[in-house]
A protein has these predicted regions:
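Exposed low-complexity, polar/acidic, P/S/T/G-rich flexible segments that act as propeptides
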Residues: 73-78, 136-154
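Noncatalytic modules at the cell exterior or secretory-pathway interfaces
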Residues: 50-58, 119-135
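A beta-strand/beta-hairpin structural motif
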Residues: 42, 91-93, 101-115, 131
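Bacterial signal peptide processing site
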Residues: 17-20
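Short acidic/polar inter-strand loop motif in beta-rich domains
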Residues: 62-65, 109-112, 118-120, 133-143
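Post-signal peptide N-terminal segment of mature Sec-exported envelope proteins
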Residues: 23-46
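C-terminal motif of bacterial Sec signal peptides marking the signal peptidase cleavage site
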Residues: 12-15
Length: 154
């Protein structure tokens, strides 16, 4: 009986998780050979409610052999009417002493960073987000995954 109660409690916790109401929660694996500038990472989401505000997060997973304390990303947002906007993001992964931010153990670190809060998408339809790294190397090594999460604002 205790096992059943524990199992039901776990199911309840998972169902209350903020990830369950995400309209986008996706991660793309970066090849072990590295992330080249000509290989953008793309995420697509369908927006049906333009009155709902959303919070947008970027997730980064890297190993501790990553050479820099930050990660620059160039982001293009394609709107349903095929217009687009550009933005440059700087993700801080470590402090100036080299101590990694984020969570993880051993040689892998996970970062969840708020990109924008209370965003209202101006048009209904399909949006595409495209990311290219903006680091000073053609082939960026030791970034393992790049992800995006869009959830209704609370």
């Amino acid at each position: 009986m205790r096992k059943l109660i524990f199992l039901l409690f776990c199911v309840y916790l998972v169902s209350c998780s903020p990830s369950n109401n995400a309209i986008l929660y996706e991660s793309v694996a970066i090849p072990e050979a590295g992330w080249t500038i000509d290989n953008p990472v793309r995420f697509t989401v369908e927006i049906v409610d333009t009155t709902q505000p959303y919070d947008i997060y970027i997730t980064v997973r890297h190993n501790t052999d990553y050479e820099w304390m930050n990660l620059f990303l160039f982001m293009k947002t394609y709107y349903p009417d095929l217009e687009f906007s550009r933005d440059t993001l700087e993700c801080f992964l470590a402090d100036e002493t080299g101590r990694w931010f984020g969570r993880g153990s051993s040689s892998v670190r996970d970062h969840v960073m708020l990109l924008q809060r209370n965003v209202r998408f101006p048009q209904k339809g399909r949006y595409q987000f495209e990311f290219v790294h903006g680091m000073r190397t053609e082939n960026l090594r030791n970034i393992m995954d790049l992800g995006m999460k869009i959830v209704p604002s609370r």
